[in-house]
């Protein structure tokens, strides 16, 4: 801290807010520090160090901190430390987690596992507990805020839900005091201290000290002699900050703490009365107003039997013991905070892995091509809770080439999603016919800020009904398009085998369905599809009744009763890049089955 006052441009702090982030995501944070934050050619965050004329990535600064911790631990243990368990905020996204892991590698460490800070805290508190308990972990640190709900018992630590805000923490409380002091000084003296980096750093240090004092005292005396100077001489700040005034300065931030708590309980399908323990983690939870908020919301006195500054590290040590085999009978089950899926036809998102899915997890779906002769597919991986692509975040995209030309719906492409125990996502697409594979590990994509995550979740609830209605329109149209395509294809292939009266009826209903699709009214499309399906059933019946036809007359109808909808997936406007997922048979496909039986 002394260095930050005398050498503010070359002293780095609160680097955690920049790790794994793009510059466009940290514009506000970059203005709150005394050192210079710049962007490189890829819009990545760099921290400028004028003393040595070099720019550092946030991972490099974090690595230096880790290296110092490793050196201290090695001296204490009298043994070399080469492996570690590293904790991160629960709402860290994929890029932030990967960047944290990179920092460990830069520091010469093998990072065995990345675990969420609230989860680590529960390990420290719940160690050796035998009774089943439901725990809420309220983790408010210097730069981030996390809430997790867990079930703990018999050595199993299962995370039920997690929520948070990666733009909220003790630094924000400090800034309110800094702004108050600077505003008062500017009003009285006409000088903006925020433009003086050395003065800004002194204000920040003093604000943090005052905040800490107000955790135990009702007022704090602030003295900053020689904060600046004018032609009239040196200027000083001498004032008093009461606890009541401090709480008034950041009352809106206190309100922001409520939402993640409420969200985490709702996602876990629990109420406050279901909680057995409430654990406070992080130095900022010492603030009386924060403690009082937790008491009022949960109706329980928080458990503070473990030092909130040390509890996460203790939990990480327990997890390290589990991985090393020194601690047994403990199982840790964490979750992913956001849903993962693909872009689908009509600009909708199809979720493959829902939010709060237990990690590690792996899920796959089989798709096919959406156009005849299609030789490639492009897959856009999304993160978020809304129904439509435009309201979610694109994590990255990749293309699978070399698919042999074939009729629409024939090739099979398996798309597999894997999220490891560290919460890092990888996606693989395999053409099952040729064995060709393409994959992507989501590490370099622009990251998703925590407040944007909360916005996504809240908007998903707010617009759920509207989104569902729009989604139904698109899904119905997609299904109708598929029915039209398949029916026309079969009529063409069957040719003169179809009796003229039957063919005319099918073509008439086809025309009605096309008109309904153009009209865009969901119910009209459904009615037209049902009418067409009836005529297609009659077509199938007429084929069975022809001499030489095989199978039972009722076979097509029985199969028809099992039909469901079809889904299509696309990445680009070019139909050659579209993916088609068939989950059932349409009525027109039944005709193809009838024809095959005739042969």
UniProtKB/Swiss-Prot annotation:
Residues 554-568 have a biased composition (Low complexity). Gene3D superfamilies: 1.20.1270.10, 3.30.420.40, Actin, Chain A, domain 4, Substrate Binding Domain Of DNAk, Chain A, domain 1. Keywords: ATP-binding, Chloroplast, Nucleotide-binding, Plastid, Stress response. Its main location: plastid. One of its GO terms (molecular function) is unfolded protein binding. It comes from the Eukaryota. Residues 545-573 are annotated as: Disordered. InterPro entries: ATPase_NBD, Chaperone_DnaK, Heat_shock_70_CS, HSP70_C_sf, HSP70_peptide-bd_sf, Hsp_70_fam. SUPFAM superfamilies: Actin-like ATPase domain, Heat shock protein 70kD (HSP70), C-terminal subdomain, Heat shock protein 70kD (HSP70), peptide-binding domain. Interacts with newly imported chloroplast proteins to assist in their maturation. NCBIfam families: PRK00290.1, prok_dnaK. This is Stromal 70 kDa heat shock-related protein, chloroplastic.
């Amino acid at each position: 801290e002394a260095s930050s006052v005398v050498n503010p441009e070359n002293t780095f702090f609160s680097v955690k807010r920049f790790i794994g982030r793009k510059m466009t995501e940290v514009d506000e944070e970059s203005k709150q520090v005394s050192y210079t934050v710049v962007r490189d050619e890829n819009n990545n965050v760099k921290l400028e160090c004028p003393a040595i004329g070099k720019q550092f990535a946030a991972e490099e600064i974090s690595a230096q901190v880790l290296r110092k911790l490793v050196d201290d631990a090695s001296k204490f243990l009298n043994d070399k430390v080469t492996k570690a368990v590293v904790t991160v905020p629960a709402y860290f996204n994929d890029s932030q987690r990967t960047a944290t892991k990179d920092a460990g590698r830069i520091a010469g460490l093998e990072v065995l596992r990345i675990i969420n800070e609230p989860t680590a805290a529960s390990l420290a508190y719940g160690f050796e507990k035998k009774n089943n308990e439901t725990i809420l972990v309220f983790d408010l640190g210097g730069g981030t805020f996390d809430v997790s709900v867990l079930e703990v018992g018999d050595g199993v630590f299962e995370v039920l839900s997690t929520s948070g805000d990666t733009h909220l923490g003790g630094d924000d409380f400090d800034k309110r005091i800094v702004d108050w002091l600077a505003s008062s000084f500017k009003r009285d003296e006409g000088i903006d201290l925020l433009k003086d980096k050395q003065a800004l750093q002194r204000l920040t240090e003093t604000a943090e000290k005052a905040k800490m004092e107000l955790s135990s005292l009702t007022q704090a005396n602030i003295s900053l002699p020689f904060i600046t100077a004018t032609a009239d001489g040196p200027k000083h700040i001498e004032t008093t900050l009461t606890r009541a005034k401090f709480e008034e300065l950041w009352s809106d931030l206190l309100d922001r703490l409520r939402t993640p708590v409420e969200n985490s309980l709702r996602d876990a399908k629990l109420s406050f009365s279901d909680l057995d323990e409430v654990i406070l983690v992080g130095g900022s939870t010492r603030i009386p107003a924060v403690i009082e908020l937790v008491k009022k919301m949960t109706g329980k006195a928080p458990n503070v039997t473990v030092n909130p500054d040390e509890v996460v590290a203790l939990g990480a040590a327990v997890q390290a013991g589990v991985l090393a085999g020194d601690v047994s009978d403990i199982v840790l089950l964490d979750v992913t905070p956001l849903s993962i899926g693909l872009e689908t036809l009509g600009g909708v998102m199809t979720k493959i892995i829902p939010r709060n899915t237990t990690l590690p997890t792996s899920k796959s779906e089989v798709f096919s091509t959406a156009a005849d002769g299609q030789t490639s597919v492009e897959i856009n991986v999304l993160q978020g809770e809304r129904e439509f692509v435009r309201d979610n975040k694109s994590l990255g995209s990749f293309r699978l080439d070399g698919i042999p030309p074939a009729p629409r719906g024939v090739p099979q492409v398996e798309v597999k999603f894997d999220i490891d125990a560290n919460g890092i996502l990888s996606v693989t697409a395999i053409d099952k016919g040729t064995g060709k594979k393409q994959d992507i590990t989501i590490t370099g994509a622009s990251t998703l800020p925590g407040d944007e995550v909360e916005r996504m979740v809240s908007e998903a609830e707010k617009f759920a009904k509207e989104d569902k209605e729009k989604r139904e329109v698109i899904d119905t149209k997609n299904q109708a398009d598929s029915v039209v395509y398949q029916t026309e294809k079969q009529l063409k292939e069957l040719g003169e085998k179809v009796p003229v009266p039957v063919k005319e009826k099918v073509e008439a209903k086809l025309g009605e369905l096309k008109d309904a699709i153009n009209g865009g009214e969901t119910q009209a499309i459904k009615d037209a599809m049902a009418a067409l399906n009836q005529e297609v059933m009659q077509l199938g019946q007429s084929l069975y009744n022809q001499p030489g036809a095989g199978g039972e007359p009722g076979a097509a109808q029985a199969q028809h009763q099992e039909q469901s909808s079809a889904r299509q997936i696309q990445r680009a406007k070019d139909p050659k890049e579209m993916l088609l997922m068939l989950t059932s048979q349409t009525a027109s496909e039944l005709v193809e089955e009838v024809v095959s039986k005739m042969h």
